[in-house]
Structure formats: C-alpha cells, structure tokens
C-alpha cells in the first residue's frame, strides 16, 4: 500500500530531519532574519505536507486493482482508521512547528498571521475527521492531481 511507510521505524524522524534541513537552507540566504527563516520553514513544510498527504490521490503502484485511486495518502494511512498514533503525530508536528516559529518570530503579528493561517487551514483542518473524504475544488489551483 502507498502509505505503509508512515508506521515504519524512522518515518517520524524524517519529519524532524526535513524541518532541520529547511531551517538550515533558509539560514543560508543573506538578509533572511531568524523570524523569516522560521516562517519560511513553517510555510514550506506545511505546503509540502499538504501536497504530499492531501492533494495527490491514488498510488504509484498498480498492484492494488484501483482500490486506492480516489483516496489521498492521508486517507490511505492505517486503512482510514482515525486517531492512530501516526495520524496524531502528523497533526502535532505542524502545530509544534507553528508554536516554535511564532516564538522565534517574537510574536510579531504579521508573522503570527502567516503562520497561523497556513498551519490552521492548510495543515490541521484537512486532517480533521470532519474533512475525511471531503473534496474542495478551487478552479485553477486544485485540478485533477491523481497518480495514474
């Protein structure tokens, strides 16, 4: 299955590694302050995880007979069982990153607004049970993102 790697050893560590690498990458740019570095790290991680877990439907492997063609990776995790340890971890990571980025942005209103909006509407809301199998189409932005 497409999402079995989420439960394997080391899958949780990769999120910390990706966040650390993003932070180091944004620190390399001259003129980027610590506030913007953390905000850009948060934005990149949140948008990347949205694309990976919620935008693309299906599976790259063809030995499942099309059973997962209409499911996102988030819906494929743990056979659609809600509130498993992996799902809880994937909900907590963006929230923790939001808190860290807000702290290092010295609670600046502009940075807080960016971080809060993205974390809430791009990272947390799509993972809630109320949005399970809910498809929202935004013309020009969300098209047919399906692996076939």
UniProtKB/Swiss-Prot annotation:
Q: How does it sit in the membrane?
A: Multi-pass membrane protein
* Coiled-coil regions listed in the entry: none
Keyword flag Transmembrane helix: yes
Q: Which residues cross the membrane?
A: 12-32, 36-56, 89-109, 111-131
GO CC terms for this protein? endoplasmic reticulum membrane
Entry keywords, A to Z = Membrane, Transmembrane, Transmembrane helix
* InterPro entries linked: ORMDL (IPR007203)
Give the record's family classification. Answer: To yeast YLR350W C-terminus.
Q: What is this protein called?
A: Protein ORM1
Q: Which organism is it from?
A: Saccharomyces pastorianus (strain ATCC 76670 / Carlsberg bottom yeast no.2 / CBS 1503 / CLIB 180 / NBRC 10610 / NRRL Y-1525) (Saaz-type lager yeast)
Q: What is the lineage of its organism?
A: Eukaryota, Fungi, Dikarya, Ascomycota, Saccharomycotina
**Gene that encodes it:** ORM1
């Amino acid at each position: 299955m497409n999402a079995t790697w989420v439960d394997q050893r080391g899958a949780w560590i990769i999120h910390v590694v990706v966040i650390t690498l993003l932070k180091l990458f944004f620190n390399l740019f001259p003129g980027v302050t610590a506030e913007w570095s953390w905000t850009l790290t948060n934005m990149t991680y949140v948008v990347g995880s949205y694309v990976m877990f919620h935008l693309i439907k299906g599976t790259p492997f063809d030995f499942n007979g099309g059973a997962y063609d209409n499911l996102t990776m988030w819906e494929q995790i743990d056979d659609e069982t809600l509130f498993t340890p992996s799902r809880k971890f994937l909900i907590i990571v963006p929230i923790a990153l939001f808190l860290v980025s807000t702290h290092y942005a010295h609670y600046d209103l502009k940075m807080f607004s960016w971080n809060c909006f993205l974390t809430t509407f791009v990272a947390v809301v799509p993972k809630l049970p109320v949005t399970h199998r809910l498809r929202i189409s935004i013309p020009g932005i969300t098209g047919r993102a399906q692996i076939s």
